[in-house]
Structures are given as C-alpha cells and as structure tokens.
Amino acid sequence: MSEEEREVLRPIIERDAISWAVAKVDQQMIDKINILKASILAMHKALDQLRQPPQYILVDGNRFKKYKRIPHQCVIQGDAKFASIAAASVLAKTHRDEYMKGLHEYFPFYNWKQNKGYPTEEHRHQITLHGICDHHRKSFRLLPDEGQPLLFQEDAMISSNSHS
C-alpha cells in the first residue's frame, strides 16, 4: 500500500473505528529492552488507551505477551488477512511517518521526511557526515563494517585510550 493510500485511509479509520489508539516507545527504551519487547510494550500501551477494551486481540506477527486476561492470536502477515490488523497497521505507519516528518524539521540533513528513519544509503551517508543524534537507536547498527560514527573528537580519544 502506498503512502498516499494510507493517508487517505487514516481519517476514515480514525472516524469509523469502534475504538483506536496509537502508542509510542522512545528509542532509549528500545535500546534498553530490544525492538521486539518495545513493540509489545507499545501494543500494550495502545490497548490501555482504548475507550472500549477488546474481547479478543489479533496481533500481526508471531510474538505477543498476554495482555490482562484477554485472549489473543498472533497471525503472520495478519495485515493481509484481517481488516482490523490492516487498519491498525495503517494507523501505526501513518502516525510514525508523521512523527518522522516532524523530526525532519529539526534534523533536515537526515532527510527523515523521505526515508522515515529507515537506513537508506542516503541516510547512512548523512550519519557519516553528521553523526547520530538522540533520536537514533544506539542498538541499531546503521553503519555495518564501519562501526558507529563518533559524535565528538573526545570520543575518539576515549575509544583509542581504552584499547591500549
């Protein structure tokens, strides 16, 4: 589904859904607990925000941690099989894209309005020029084989001193 199609669907889903919520887990928490646990945490946070609690939870993917006493089912490629999962995917993606476009205003050199934070060749190149910022996940290797770029020259001194 294209970005334009998702943008058309988003207000329809938000208007017509019985209940919906989107939750975010910041990059520091992702670095601390890992991306899978952070995704499950975000799902739980979104479930906490629903006006009406679900009777059954459908999850896109193969992992989920039980939420309260509500039964759940994990469905691989669930967004292609269930309208509710597809709608949740549209909301999650459009809200994340909106967040990344907002970050782009502060960090235009990463071109987050275009790459949405994905490690494109251009994004990786900009990291080699500007380093990473607080909005990058430190646990995600953006520059394989080259290591992470250093933000400050002092980091190079500390790094080289620690290997002596």
Regions inferred by a protein language model and the residue ranges of each:
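RNase H-like, Mg2+-dependent phosphodiesterase core
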Residues: 1-164
